[in-house]
């Protein structure tokens, strides 16, 4: 079946072509329709946040305005701390960083809704984001420093004999940033959702196995209490992973933007 009443269905990938054409073979894509729909919704939410934050000039701000202003100020603070207090750089890169943070955070939060979908739990989404980030960072480095960009792969004071080896190591390290950025986010988000599924399944199995009403109540109440606590922790993880993703993106940008300052 295409749709199952299973909270872990979001981890199953259904081919978009097979879902539309009814064929499970020779599919041309592995992107699920749910993924496409949720990404579209998240994009609309991010644009809505931008629009509201840009058009709200109230003398007495509402709570929503205060939340948005705090949101914007926090991301702007990260950009300034990592890339520098230069107003020009902050204004240039802030919209990009803010968009990445908003996208990842909203994706993580939407995934906390039962029977919903978490795009960031799929490596195809996070790897696509991280590869796009590293390509963009590389292009920015080339545009600002031209051929001097390659000095990033040669640490200062390196003996001439060690230059080929260190260039290879630095290049591999630079390329691996995309994979580490994607895997970190996917692993942390997926781990929490899998833990929810395991505890829920054990609770249902234990409830079916026992016959006493008292024991049934215990097997339902205790796991439910644990799930509530884990739910709160997952909300914190959703925010924390968004922050880490944004912080690392700013750090990678700072490496190429401020090359001449090191």
From Swiss-Prot:
GO cellular component: mitochondrial inner membrane; proton-transporting ATP synthase complex
InterPro entries: ATP_synth_F0_asu (IPR000568), ATP_synth_F0_asu_AS (IPR023011), ATP_synth_F0_asu_bact/mt (IPR045083), F0_ATP_A_sf (IPR035908)
Topology within the bilayer: Multi-pass membrane protein
Gene Ontology MF annotations: proton-transporting ATP synthase activity, rotational mechanism
Signal peptide per UniProt: none
Keywords: ATP synthesis, CF(0), Hydrogen ion transport, Ion transport, Membrane, Mitochondrion, Mitochondrion inner membrane, Transmembrane, Transmembrane helix, Transport
Gene3D superfamilies on file: ATP synthase, F0 complex, subunit A
UniProt subcellular location: Mitochondrion inner membrane
Transmembrane annotation, as ranges: 30-50, 64-84, 91-111, 123-143, 149-169, 195-215, 220-240
Self-association and partners: F-type ATPases have 2 components, CF(1) - the catalytic core - and CF(0) - the membrane proton channel. CF(1) has five subunits: alpha(3), beta(3), gamma(1), delta(1), epsilon(1). CF(0) has three main subunits: a, b and c.
PANTHER family linked to this entry: ATP SYNTHASE SUBUNIT A
Family of the protein in this entry: Belongs to the ATPase A chain family.
Biological function: Mitochondrial membrane ATP synthase (F(1)F(0) ATP synthase or Complex V) produces ATP from ADP in the presence of a proton gradient across the membrane which is generated by electron transport complexes of the respiratory chain. F-type ATPases consist of two structural domains, F(1) - containing the extramembraneous catalytic core and F(0) - containing the membrane proton channel, linked together by a central stalk and a peripheral stalk. During catalysis, ATP synthesis in the catalytic domain of F(1) is coupled via a rotary mechanism of the central stalk subunits to proton translocation.
Protein name: ATP synthase subunit a
Encoding gene, per UniProt annotation: ATP6
